[in-house]
C-alpha cells in the first residue's frame, strides 16, 4: 500500500512538472514588451504627480500581491499591499486620488474583488488589471489590462491555483523590469535599499568609500 502511494505521488509530481513546463513555455511566448508600455506609463505618470502604487488580490493572488509590493519597492518603485477584502472595510483609506492599483484575479469575476475595484475607482484611483480572462469584468473595468492566462492549473483536480499563480507572478515581474529600467536603478541605490543578506554583501563593491 505504501509503495503504491509513493508511486502515485511521484506520478502526480511528474504530471504537474510537465504541465507547468508546457504552460510556462506557452505563456512566456505571449510576453512582449509593448504589452507593458501602457501599464508602465500609467504608473510613471502617477508617480510624477506624487501618486503611489498599490497591489491587491483575493485568495492566492493576494499572496502574489504582497510579494509584488515588496519586489516593486526594492527595485525603485515604492509600493503598498492593499488587502483584498479589508479594502472595503476601511483600508481604502491608504489610497489617495491619482494613485495606481494593480488588481490580480485569474477569473476576473471574483465577487469580493469586484467590490474592492469599485471602491478603488470611487476613490479616484487608476486600475491595472492582471487576469487570465481578457473578456472578464476586471479587464473591462481596468484602465490597462495585462493577460496572465493558462490552459490548466496542474495537480490533482486541476482546481487549486498553481500554474495561474506562476503566470501572474511572471507577468508582474516583467512589469517590474520595465519600471526598473525607467528608474535608472544602479547598484548603489539597490544596496542602500537592500543592505541585508547575501545581496547586501554587494555593498562593499557598490557603495562609494
Residue ranges, per PLM feature:
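An N-terminal, well-structured beta->alpha segment
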Residues: 1-49
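Glycine-rich phosphate/diphosphate-binding loops and the adjacent beta-loop-alpha structural elements
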Residues: 6, 51-54, 58, 198-209
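General structural signal for secondary-structure boundaries
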Residues: 8, 32, 83, 183-187
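Residue-level signal for pocket-adjacent positions within structured domains
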Residues: 22, 26, 83, 90, ...
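Secondary-structure transition/capping residues
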Residues: 35, 54, 186-190
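Residue-level signal for alpha-helical context at structural boundaries
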Residues: 38, 42, 61, 193-194, ...
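Glycine-rich phosphate-binding loops that contact phosphosugars or nucleotide phosphates
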Residues: 44, 52-183
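Internal, active-site/partner-interface "lid" segment
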Residues: 137-140, 154, 181-209
Amino acid at each position: 500500500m505504501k509503495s503504491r502511494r509513493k508511486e502515485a505521488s511521484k506520478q502526480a509530481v511528474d504530471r504537474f512538472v510537465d504541465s507547468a513546463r508546457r504552460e510556462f513555455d506557452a505563456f512566456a511566448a505571449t510576453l512582449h514588451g509593448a504589452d507593458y508600455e501602457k501599464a508602465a506609463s500609467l504608473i510613471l505618470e502617477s508617480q510624477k504627480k506624487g501618486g503611489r502604487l498599490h497591489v491587491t488580490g483575493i485568495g492566492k493572488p493576494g499572496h502574489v500581491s504582497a510579494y509584488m509590493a515588496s519586489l516593486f519597492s526594492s527595485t525603485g518603485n515604492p509600493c503598498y499591499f492593499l488587502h483584498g477584502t479589508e479594502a472595503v472595510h476601511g483600508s481604502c483609506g491608504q489610497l489617495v486620488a491619482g494613485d495606481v492599483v494593480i488588481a490580480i484575479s485569474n477569473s476576473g469575476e471574483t465577487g469580493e474583488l469586484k467590490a474592492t475595484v469599485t471602491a478603488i475607482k470611487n476613490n479616484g484611483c487608476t486600475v491595472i488589471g492582471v487576469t487570465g480572462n481578457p473578456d472578464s469584468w476586471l479587464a473591462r473595468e481596468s484602465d490597462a489590462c495585462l493577460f496572465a492566462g493558462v490552459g490548466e492549473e496542474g495537480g490533482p483536480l486541476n482546481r487549486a491555483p498553481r500554474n495561474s499563480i506562476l503566470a501572474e507572478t511572471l507577468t508582474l515581474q516583467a512589469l517590474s523590469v520595465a519600471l526598473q529600467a525607467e528608474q535608472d536603478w544602479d547598484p548603489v541605490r539597490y544596496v542602500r535599499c537592500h543592505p541585508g543578506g547575501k545581496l547586501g554583501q554587494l555593498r562593499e563593491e557598490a557603495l562609494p568609500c
